[in-house]
């Protein structure tokens, strides 16, 4: 009886450890493939912000430039040879994406 309880605990702990979220998952926004990323204070990005009417002072996180969505990681045709990022605001038709964080798709 004690062996069965111990075995159940070991198996349960192993399964719990194996079900953590992968680091290639985007939990807070959309998965994007951007041609470049940078700070809002970068002169080229600041020019884009001026054209789009975005206040540079309001943006503190990484910015993605010329982005397209990545729909299914690992599916054919959905690779990202540039910078894969997870962005919280991609409402500028791919020109810029705000609140981005780099992720690793090679895991």
UniProtKB/Swiss-Prot annotation:
Alphabetical list of InterPro entries matching this protein? Hydrophobin
Work out whether the entry's keyword set contains Cytoplasm.
no
Where this protein primarily resides, as one coarse class? Answer: secreted
**Single GO molecular function:** structural constituent of cell wall
Could you tell me the keywords of this UniProt record? Cell wall, Disulfide bond, Glycoprotein, Secreted, Signal
Subunit annotation: Self-assembles to form functional amyloid fibrils called rodlets. Self-assembly into fibrillar rodlets occurs spontaneously at hydrophobic:hydrophilic interfaces and the rodlets further associate laterally to form amphipathic monolayers.
Which family, according to the similarity comment?
Belongs to the fungal hydrophobin family.
The protein here is known as Class I hydrophobin 3
Q: Which gene encodes it?
A: pnh3
């Amino acid at each position: 009886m004690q062996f069965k309880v111990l075995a159940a605990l070991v198996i349960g702990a192993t399964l719990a450890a194996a079900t953590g979220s992968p680091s290639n998952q985007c939990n807070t926004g959309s998965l994007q493939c951007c041609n470049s990323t940078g700070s809002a204070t970068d002169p080229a990005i600041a020019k884009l912000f001026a054209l789009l009417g975005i206040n540079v002072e309001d943006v503190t996180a990484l910015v993605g430039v010329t982005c397209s969505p990545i729909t299914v990681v690992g599916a054919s045709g959905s690779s990202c040879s540039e910078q894969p990022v997870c962005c919280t605001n991609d409402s500028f038709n791919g020109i810029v994406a705000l609140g981005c964080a780099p992720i690793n798709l090679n895991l």
